[in-house]
Amino acid sequence: LYDMYELGIRYDKPYRKSARIVGDTMGKYHPHGDSSIYDSLVVMAQDFKKGQVLVDGHGNFGSIEGDGAAAMRYTEARLTKFTQEVCLADLDKNVIDFGPNFDETEKEPLVLPMRVPNLLINGAEGIAVGMATSIPTHNLCEVVDAVKAYMKNDKITTKQLMKYIKGPDFPTGGIVVNKDDLPAIYESGQGKIKLRGKVEVEELKGGKKQLVITEIPYTMIGAGIGKFLNDVCNLVESKKTTDIVDISNQSSKEGIRIVIELKRGADVENLKNMLYKKTRLEDTFGVNMLAVANGRPETLSLKQIIEHHVDFQFELATRKYTTLLGKEREKSEVQEGLIKACDVIDLIIEILRGSKSVKDARACLVNGETENIKFKSAISKKMAAMLRFTERQATAILEMRLYRLIGLEIEALQKEHEKTLENIARYEDILNNYDSMAGVIMEELDSYKKEFGRK
């Protein structure tokens, strides 16, 4: 993601070949083969695996039925707007630490300045030596509301947070059967979630009916769909059910649609229960919310994940507004110097014309040194000796263009300075007032919820 950001492959720019992205990433940051890099890029582009897609893929990026993506030389990609605005925002404002890459020729971010808990929204699955993690995906709107609730009351319990986060929200849909187990799972960070596919009954002509599966357990992604179709066929062939006439997979880009045509008079409820019992239409998602927190792997509760995220947001905001405040103070210093210079511009011009070098002129502006400067009068020399511009102001004066002396330009400079002072006051308030900083963070969360959230 960072490499795509650095290459300028933004959401509002043209797609670039995946091979170009993979090659650049491998050469700069990950010299361990291209397959793992491309596989990662592909997963981040698959909307059936991610709650929020991080990469906008163009071409064949695989299917929910387990078809692999086309070779990287054929596909193209770019960042999504979500990634650019929520995952990579303010990288130029010193909000995170950077470290050297493998050969110390580049800098790479140690973390990304994620503005929402991506660990909850997009989930995570993986294994390492002696440990594994499995975190389900969640709804962005619900997660944002939970984060805001924690910020308003950090004594809130996990059970109270579940007023906002009802449970997992998988890209493939599905129904959580054991909802009563969710509080314990979110409290301990471990457990098993029973998922069922969503089955609808459609009436056909002649009194016939058909079952239509529109949502599936997340665990059925890939080969699981094909296995389900085979399992249903086996139920028919082994005479365990005689109610099924035909089964077809009519899924498309619009969504899942698996149709099971039934005989007239079929026992619908009995058949649904059989499908849940004998196939993966009901399956288990194992939860183990293991994550690296403060450099150590730790199994976290729902509240702990949100707590770590909120702490990180305050760290990001503190670094961001400290950087902005520093820049505004520097700008104010320069503006004050230019405004002051305009009031004594004739004297400054006399200093410049009488100086033998830029060094002499700067010394006069900063320290009032007049020894190496020719003045028209003793009064001018006396006034010059009283000048005390800062180094930054002196540089700005020496680089100032003559058009800045126009009356309207001076007036505009004064208005600009007033705006700078307002910004300084605002940034100081944010940095010195918890409620102000929390308000800014929550405003950003609301904007992300409005733009990227879904029901």
Protein language model regions, located:
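C-terminal interaction appendages of subunits in large macromolecular complexes
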Residues: 125, 131-455
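Catalytic phosphate-handling regions of large nucleic-acid enzymes and associated NTPases
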Residues: 1-189, 257-259
